[in-house]
Regions:
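Short linear motifs in intrinsically disordered, low-complexity N-terminal regions enriched in Ser/Thr
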Residues: 4-7
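Intrinsically disordered, low-complexity segments enriched in serine/proline and basic residues
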Residues: 10-13
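Conserved acidic/glycine
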Residues: 15-124, 317-320, 325-409
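Structural signal for conserved beta-strand scaffold positions within catalytic alpha/beta enzyme cores
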Residues: 68, 141, 273-275
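A short, flexible beta-alpha/helix-coil linker loop
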Residues: 72-73, 146, 243-246
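Cofactor-binding active-site loop characterized by glycine-rich and histidine/acidic residues
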Residues: 99-102, 106-232, 250-256, 261, ...
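A general secondary-structure junction signal
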Residues: 143, 304-306, 388
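Glycine-rich ThDP/TPP pyrophosphate-binding loop and its adjacent helix/strand module
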Residues: 180-375
Length: 409
């Protein structure tokens, strides 16, 4: 079968450059979605972030960083209180996600997946932020944020069906607190504010987090969502993955603001800038923002500085037309997987054998998910009509009958 041919040779050379292959004894972890509860606790001891801009918080415009690119700890006072197993699990998820990403790109090129937005380079933002949440917290993603959904419990095979436009890909399990990715840029910001308002009215200790790129911060829904959250002091986290380009438009050509974090000032909410290639810095920032939210202190805007190595999407974007190889090379030196791997190795928590095990685990999990997606019955128009209303109006009943007649032939 095709999926069984997935070998390390199908993963881009960038993944392996300086990056040894692996994962120890599977780290005691099974497939995607299993063993996630270890991250779904929030410490009451986390320091509370004050309502200040990033400039006021750090004394300059430098993003928060805990690990330097060489893996050394530069802010030991901000180190998250994670066990050795939890640190290894962060690495496992990042390695797994990169393998899955490369496989998805390959499947897209062969016509076996539809719309897909590559994630390589942004794993620290995705994995670090989701790991700081509880299972009860709600994720409202954009189209690039499939990893956060899957690590929050959304089945991987459904993610592949979603990419194919299959209705089953949009059926979210009742116990998984996510919405499907928002294609309308920044629309999820107002939706997240609404989810958070519901939590506040019910007195629930939960937060909503919404993800978007730097381009979304030029949209009206971004400002409306933040303003609403600011007025009502809602438990919501606005997480901007600033990879420097809104498709092909560089950051400096879409806003006169010095950075994204300062845009929180107008809404009267807290903000922070973090090194989005540092998984521990991301974890720390989201943990603080969550604590603020459940303590009734309101919303937080987080700007994570990161970089996508591949195209904006697989729909024909050519990043070489608007950025240089030299620029990408500079960002690859800050690679989140390489950085965290060096940190773990210095603590004796990671080895080449560990990494190899995770790669094999990821390849098998992706193969199994694709197989399950392939075996899912093809979607019928009559099924699509059934999910539009709880009780179908007469006009749709007639249309359904027509399609059922056609499908039965």
């Amino acid at each position: 079968m095709f999926v069984s041919t997935f070998s390390t040779g199908e993963i881009s050379p960038m993944f392996f450059r300086q990056f040894s292959l692996s994962a120890r004894a599977r780290l005691g972890c099974a497939g995607v979605g299993e063993g996630l509860s270890r991250f779904h606790d929030t410490s009451d001891e986390v320091k509370v972030m004050s309502v200040k801009t990033a400039v006021e918080k750090t004394g300059n415009n430098t993003p928060l960083q805990i690990l330097a690119p060489d893996g050394t700890v530069v802010r030991p006072d901000l180190m998250p209180k994670l066990s050795d197993d939890e640190l290894r699990e962060l690495m496992r998820r990042m390695v797994f996600t990169r393998v899955w990403d490369q496989r998805a790109i390959s499947l897209n090129r062969q016509g076996r997946l539809g719309f897909y937005a590559p994630v390589a380079g942004q794993e620290a933002c995705m994995i670090g932020s989701e790991a700081a949440l509880s299972k009860e917290d709600f994720i409202l993603p954009s189209y690039r944020d499939i990893p956060q959904m899957v690590w929050h419990g959304f089945p991987l095979y459904k993610a592949f069906l979603y990419s194919r436009g299959h209705i089953e890909g949009g059926r979210i399990p009742e116990d998984v607190n996510v919405l499907m990715p928002q294609i309308i840029i920044a629309a999820q910001c107002t939706q997240a504010a609404g989810v958070a308002m519901g939590y506040k009215l019910r007195g629930e200790k939960r937060v909503a987090i919404t993800y978007f790129g730097d381009g979304a911060t030029s949209q009206g829904d971004f400002y409306e969502g933040m303003n609403f959250a600011g007025v009502y002091k809602l438990p919501v986290i606005f997480f901007s993955q600033n990879n420097g380009y809104a498709i092909s438009v560089p950051f400096e050509k879409q806003t006169a603001a010095e950075n994204i974090a300062v845009k929180a000032v107008a809404a009267g909410i807290a903000s922070a800038r973090v090194d989005g290639m540092d998984v521990l810095a991301v974890y720390h920032a989201v943990q603080e923002a969550k604590q603020r939210g459940i303590n009734g202190e309101g919303a937080t805007l987080i700007e994570a500085l990161t970089y996508r190595y591949g195209p904006h999407t697989m729909a024909g974007d050519d990043p070489t037309r608007y950025r240089t190889g030299e620029e990408q090379g500079e960002w690859e030196q800050k690679d989140p997987l390489i950085r965290f791997r060096k940190f773990l190795e210095s603590k004796g928590l990671w080895s080449e054998k560990d990494e190899e095990a995770v790669i094999e685990e990821a390849k098998q999990a992706v193969a199994d998910a694709i197989k399950k997606a392939d075996e899912t019955p093809k979607m019928k128009v009559s099924e699509l009509i059934d999910v539009m209303f709880e009780t179908l109006p007469p006009a749709l009943e007639e249309q359904k009958a027509e399609y059922l007649a056609k499908e039965s032939k």
